[in-house]
Swiss-Prot record:
Localization, UniProt: Vacuole membrane; Endosome membrane
Membrane-topology annotation of the record: Single-pass type II membrane protein
Pfam families per UniProt: SPRY
The name this protein goes by in its record: Protein SSH4
Length: 542
């Protein structure tokens, strides 16, 4: 009977799978539908597949990280002085400022290609340019660049100075005393004003200014600085460059022309370790332009801005300490930037067009269409000059550097705070000594309006300072034949008597600050004084 009730209680139950159908023993239907079961199996298999792929990618990345270098790369892990550089730097070295093509040839191929390029480019240069190139090679051979990982150049003392002073701790190093006249007088190539403003003088031939500290390691995404072209003559006989470089850097070379340097040249050329012809990839600079350089820590990317607009990302995976550098050169001593060199440059299409228009107008019939050559090119650049025989004064160039002490033209740098640090550091701004805060003091202002009144006739805290006893001077003595004279008797007095009188007077002197005494004490003192005077007169007569 109970089995029949159980069967009636589950009329829709099916038999258990794998057993013969039994109408008596049945269970509830809790199985998943066929479509849902297929979806679940598909998801499980898909997750397993993705997990295996992720594991394979992790293994490949580990292998490339630790076992991807070959013997040739490991052989370059030491400098010429035998000191090793960290693993991190050489993993970032794959596209580190090698040349304008951003290629990474081997050491042998690099040397051979350099020899081929020297044989091609050096004959096109002036003797002055060739001399600079040879001096640069010798300089960096004797003093190789300090290629160190980012943030390793500074010691603990330098870091503390930067932390305390902030941007105020940065400044450009002064000019090297290498340019003198026939009398040995120093002719500075540039002046440093207000720590960060560099003015290149008329004595400049070719020089560069480097900052005392490298790019800082702050807690932002990037670090950024801007340089404003404060003074630069139109059609100038000089060029300048702005960029980043290692230390020590040849002081007689502009940035971008020596190893481990990158620069934005005023001609619009982008130079990366390139002393020869470079490509014109950027706008030409004029007076009032603002050039910016930034460095992103995460990717090691260097980017350039012009008048607040980002132009390009120049390099990637740069992981070394770089210094801010400014340089200028007198182009009259070069062939590259004179008329012939500018004609040979394939990027100077506008110059060739202006020169052809100049020749056409000057040879035309109408004199009103005459164009002065000074509007196209400086007269000093019409031919190559020799600095040893023909001295040409350089046009003055003034560049102002902004590390964050002022607002940036590049908006992103202001929003994300890419400055070198705080303006005054942890110490803060120094106190003001110009008197503006003092003038706002209410007490001092009230004192100026109502000067205090001092008592004149009343006996004040210090007593009667106007009494005759305290203000009278001792009687003057006249001297005759070396002996003091008595004013009353007009006779000489012996020195012994004078000494006795002096002692008596010293005892009788009252202090300058008098104190009121009782009347009895004052009367007795006057009697003693009269007795002493009578005694002294008797001694004199005797």
């Amino acid at each position: 009977m109970g089995l029949i009730v159980l069967q009636d209680g589950f009329p829709n139950d099916r038999p258990i799978q794998g057993f013969p159908s039994d109408p008596v023993v049945r269970v509830p239907d809790d199985t998943i539908p066929a479509d849902d079961a297929f979806s679940l199996m598909f998801l499980i298999s898909l997750s397993i597949t993705f997990g295996l792929l992720l594991l394979v990618l992790i293994l490949i990345s580990i292998y490339l990280t630790f076992c991807g270098g070959n013997d040739g790369d490991d052989s370059d892990d030491e400098d010429e002085d035998g000191t090793s550089v960290s693993f991190k730097f050489f993993r970032k070295r794959n596209s580190l400022l090698l040349d304008s093509s951003f290629m990474t040839p081997g050491k042998f191929d690099d040397d051979e290609s350099l020899k081929v390029r020297e044989a091609k480019e050096l004959p096109k240069m002036s003797s002055f340019e060739v001399e600079l190139y040879e001096r640069t090679k010798e300089f960096q051979k004797m003093s190789p660049p300090m290629v160190k990982p980012l943030g390793s150049f500074l010691n603990s003392q330098d870091k503390q100075v930067i932390k305390d002073r902030g941007i105020q701790s940065y400044f450009f190093l002064p000019s090297i005393n290498d340019n003198v006249d026939i009398n040995g007088a120093f002719l500075p190539s540039f002046f440093v004003e207000d720590k960060l403003n560099v003015s290149f003088t008329k004595f400049n031939i070719s020089s560069s200014a480097i900052m005392n500290y490298p790019l800082p390691m702050n807690k932002k995404d990037a670090v950024y600085f801007e340089v404003k072209v404060y003074k630069f003559k139109t059609c100038s006989n000089s060029i300048f460059s702005i960029g980043l470089m290692t230390c020590p850097y040849p002081y007689f070379r502009i940035p971008g022309t020596a190893a481990y340097s990158i620069a934005y040249e005023s001609t619009g050329k982008l130079r990366i370790n390139n002393a020869f012809g470079a490509d014109t990839l950027l706008p030409k600079l004029e007076e009032g332009d603002v050039v910016g350089f930034g460095y992103r820590y995460s990717s090691g990317t260097i980017f350039i801005t012009h008048n607040g607009k980002k132009m390009m990302d120049v390099t990637h995976k740069v992981g070394i300490d770089l210094f801010v550098g400014l340089g200028a050169m007198n182009a009259a001593y070069t062939r590259t930037y004179t008329k012939d060199g500018l004609f040979e440059d394939p990027d100077n299409v506008s110059f060739r067009q202006k020169w052809s228009e100049l020749q056409a107008f000057n040879n035309g019939e109408s004199s009103s269409d005459y164009i002065d050559a000074r509007n196209v090119i400086s007269k000093d650049l019409l031919q190559v000059h020799d600095p040893k025989e023909d001295t040409v004064s350089s046009d003055n160039i003034e560049l102002h550097v902004n590390l964050g002490q002022l607002g940036f033209v590049f908006i992103e740098a202001n929003v994300k705070k890419y400055a070198f640090g705080s303006v005054y550091g942890d110490i803060g701004i120094p106190p003001a000594y110009n008197g503006d805060d003092i003038k706002q003091d209410m007490l001092l202002q009230k004192g100026d309006e109502l000067p205090p009144e001092y008592p004149d006739d009343a006996v004040d805290f210090f007593g009667d300072i106007h009494s005759p006893a305290s203000t009278s001077e001792p009687p003057s003595a006249t001297f005759s034949a070396g002996l003091p004279m008595d004013n009353a008797a007009d006779t000489p007095v012996s020195t012994a008597d004078a000494d006795a009188d002096a002692d008596a007077d010293a005892d009788e002197e009252e202090p300058l600050i008098s104190v009121k005494k009782p009347a009895a004490q004052t009367h007795s003192k006057k009697n003693n004084k009269k007795k002493k005077k009578k005694k002294s007169n008797r001694n004199r007569r005797g």
